A protein has these predicted regions:
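Bacterial N-terminal signal peptides
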Residues: 5-14
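Low-complexity, acidic Ser/Thr/Pro/Gly-rich terminal tails and inter-domain linkers that flank the onset
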Residues: 19-48, 52, 148
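Short coil/turn motifs at beta-sheet boundaries
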Residues: 38-40, 57, 109
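The feature marks short-to-medium sequence segments in extracytoplasmic or secretory-pathway proteins
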Residues: 55-100, 105
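Terminal connector regions
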Residues: 99-153
Length: 153
């Protein structure tokens, strides 16, 4: 029996362990394809991610990189989980959006979609792409603002 325990222990040590995602979120799946619309051609990447941090996240920021035949990055774009897509809009102030509460936090273990694209006319030729999680800040409790007491009657 002791021999069996030693063998099982050795097998467990030798088995590859799946480490928790250090970034706090995991890309579950993604697909990319050329599309056209609004008079432009673009390579659209859509996918799903999961909050693996064990706590609520303010947002998940991802980087999609276009790769040439040698694996070199020829273009990149940053994007966010679906609930936080407004953070990527150039005309909006991300800090104000986050402080206003307009960006819904991503609960622990929740899954959500993401998307990003490359315009054909602005992107060098590429043969593949990759998606990486680059930011996963923890959601912080909102401050409670006390209102002054009204006049006593």
């Amino acid at each position: 029996m002791r021999w069996l325990a030693l063998v099982l222990g050795a097998l467990l040590l030798a088995a590859p362990a799946r480490a928790a995602d250090a970034a706090g979120a995991q890309v579950l799946e993604h697909k990319g394809r050329w599309e056209s619309g609004y008079g432009a051609q673009f390579y659209n990447v859509v996918g799903r991610l999961k909050n693996t941090s064990g706590h609520e996240l303010r947002y998940v920021k991802l980087r999609i990189e276009a790769l040439d035949e040698h694996g070199n990055v020829v273009a990149r774009t940053d994007t966010y989980n679906e609930s936080a897509e407004a953070l990527a809009v150039p005309d909006l102030n991300p800090r104000e959006l986050l402080e206003s509460g307009k960006v819904k936090p991503l609960p622990a273990d929740a899954e959500e979609r993401f998307r990003g694209s490359f315009l054909k006319e602005e992107t060098p030729a590429f043969t593949d792409y990759r998606v990486k999680v680059i930011e996963t800040p923890a959601a912080t409790p909102m401050k409670v603002i006390e209102t002054p007491a009204g006049p006593s009657e």
